[in-house]
Amino acid sequence: QILLTQSPAIMSASPGQKVTMTCSASSSVSYMYWYQQKPGSSPRLLIYDTSNLASGVPVRFSGSGSATSYSLTITRMQAEDAATYYCQQWSSYPPMLTFGAGTKLELK
């Protein structure tokens, strides 16, 4: 089983500030996915296959990383970006879907 550890657990940023959060895997993974969730809403896919932007996601979001170390960056924080962000990986053998515990991003 692969454990995903997200850091920090909670962070705050001012409008216009660059934000970076990380996701560390206990074993090497091929790809990472990132989701944004706001209270009362379903998770929204932001990044797939580590660095590809999902449809309709603003270009201020980007993903990077490899092996056991991955990150999500917001180049310029906006008020609507306040949310909880989750990383997720898919292992084909054995078939397993794993999520991190989340990073809560608050507006400062």
Swiss-Prot record:
One of its GO terms (cellular component) is immunoglobulin complex. Residues 24-33 are annotated as: Complementarity-determining-1. InterPro entries: Ig-like_dom, Ig-like_dom_sf, Ig-like_fold, Ig_sub, Ig_V-set, IgV_Light_Chain. Pfam families: V-set. Residues 56-87 are annotated as: Framework-3. PROSITE patterns: IG_LIKE. Disulfide bonds join C23-C87. Keywords: Adaptive immunity, Disulfide bond, Hybridoma, Immunity, Immunoglobulin. Residues 34-48 are annotated as: Framework-2. Residues 88-98 are annotated as: Complementarity-determining-3. PANTHER family: IMMUNOGLOBULIN LIGHT CHAIN. This is Ig kappa chain V-VI region NQ2-6.1. It comes from Mus musculus.
